[in-house]
Amino acid sequence: MPLSEAAVKVQAALQERGLETPMLPSVFTPEERKDKIEHHMKEILTLMSLDLSDDSLADTPRRIAKMYVDEIFSGLDYANFPKITVIDNKMGFDEMVRVQDISLTSTCEHHLVTIDGTATIAYLPRKKIIGLSKINRIVRFFAQRPQVQERLTQQVLVALQTLLETKDVAVKMDAVHYCVKSRGVMDSTSSTTTTALGGIFKSNPATRAEFLHQSK
């Protein structure tokens, strides 16, 4: 299936800036990927001495394969990029548009465990205005990959800048990393904050302060 114009533009913008997730070209269909993941997951679980003949575990390899391809890693396939509604700013609206407390669930690419957090997005309309739900969908698309939070924040920024045809976009993310919470140092209270600021949000101290203050 050919990619949408929005998906092509966003992918090219990320590649140009060196912000694309490290990926190899896929030579398999989604169903072929599921079959191969299921096969290898059976081997992994067997190596862990789990009895896959037990009815509780028998379908686990297939469940994981479907979850990886259709859900938590679906953002690796630009065919799943959300349908984007961007309209001309005919009303001349020029005040800050802000969407906050966007829920996001991603996966740490170092240990493949959960990143759980929220995002706040703002932009100053110029030529284009985007449907509000599309902002949430763009966050979700890029979260549905193995990620590091710093890259995820930048990817959402560049995607919105590309689609809105303006640099005046700001992104802030706050998240708990289960690679910190459930293993290693096992710190259950810390969280990580990242920001990506463009245009006037980066160059104008008052606009930056307004965004960051309201994001608390």
Curated annotation (Swiss-Prot):
SUPFAM superfamilies: Tetrahydrobiopterin biosynthesis enzymes-like
Gene Ontology annotations for the cellular component aspect, listed alphabetically: cytoplasm
InterPro entries the record matches: GTP-CH-I_C/QueF (IPR043133), GTP-CH-I_N (IPR043134), GTP_CycHdrlase_I (IPR001474), GTP_CycHdrlase_I_CS (IPR018234), GTP_CycHdrlase_I_dom (IPR020602)
GO molecular function: GTP binding; GTP cyclohydrolase I activity; zinc ion binding
This enzyme's EC code(s): 3.5.4.16
Pathway listed: Cofactor biosynthesis; 7,8-dihydroneopterin triphosphate biosynthesis; 7,8-dihydroneopterin triphosphate from GTP: step 1/1
Domain of life the protein comes from: Bacteria
BP GO annotations: one-carbon metabolic process; tetrahydrobiopterin biosynthetic process; tetrahydrofolate biosynthetic process
Cited PROSITE patterns: GTP_CYCLOHYDROL_1_1 (PS00859), GTP_CYCLOHYDROL_1_2 (PS00860)
Keywords annotated in UniProt: GTP-binding, Hydrolase, Metal-binding, Nucleotide-binding, One-carbon metabolism, Zinc
Residues forming coiled coils: none
Binding of Zn(2+), residues: 108, 111, 179
Pfam families: GTP_cyclohydroI (PF01227)
Catalytic function, reaction form: GTP + H2O = 7,8-dihydroneopterin 3'-triphosphate + formate + H(+)
Family affiliation: Belongs to the GTP cyclohydrolase I family.
Assembly mode: Toroid-shaped homodecamer, composed of two pentamers of five dimers.
HAMAP family associated with the record: FolE
Descriptive protein name: GTP cyclohydrolase 1
